[in-house]
Amino acid sequence: MGGIGLLPAMAFDGSTMLALSVYAPDFPGSKPTPMSKATRNRLINAIVFFAENTDCCGKIKLFKLLYLLDFEHFKQTGKSVTGFEYQAWKFGPVPVDLMEEWEDLGPDLARAVCIVPQRVLDFERMQVEVLPGVEFDSDDFTERQLSIMRALAARYKNTYSPQMIDVTHEQNGAWDKVWQDGRGSHEVIPYALSITDDALDREGFLKVASQQAMYQSALEAARINAGA
């Protein structure tokens, strides 16, 4: 997946590796870690942001925007924004957890947005709308994350989801490498595919990200056990 001309990606030098060793990334492995409250709040705010700042924000468009946000941010920092795991489906990358929640939104998400029918040309589609009184909270995000979100909202403000296929279905991109003409249907799209093969110290960067994913998983497990 090509970059979208935002903040420069991190240089993977010694200081970056040290920073990554402290700031654990959400690096999806074979078993996704449970979503923390902070990450859940960030996800809800990201949905609010895209619903407020783009037109025709239905399910598929929202899924694509979240995918582009997560994979661009991972490409730059080694950490996703929402912590979602994406699968390769025919119509593009799908955050499966959100897909499963779509028909019955969790109480916290339902307090922020609703899904309403909207007539578009000759058919009816479901659109995400922000509920009255709900405001986007930028405090949940870093400046880098906000920059990516603003750039995506500006680029795809008036774009319908079918017109975004050229981006999410980019030849030899992350989705395409997994999808493989349907052979990889419903397979997980590794975040590592957002890092090009010729990236400086790619293997070292991904190794640190993987190690810190295990650390993050251990923290989440401890949090869950403490609340049990």
Predicted feature descriptions by range:
Residues 2-7:
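Extreme N-terminal basic, low-complexity initiation segments
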Residues 11-228:
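Domain-edge interaction signal
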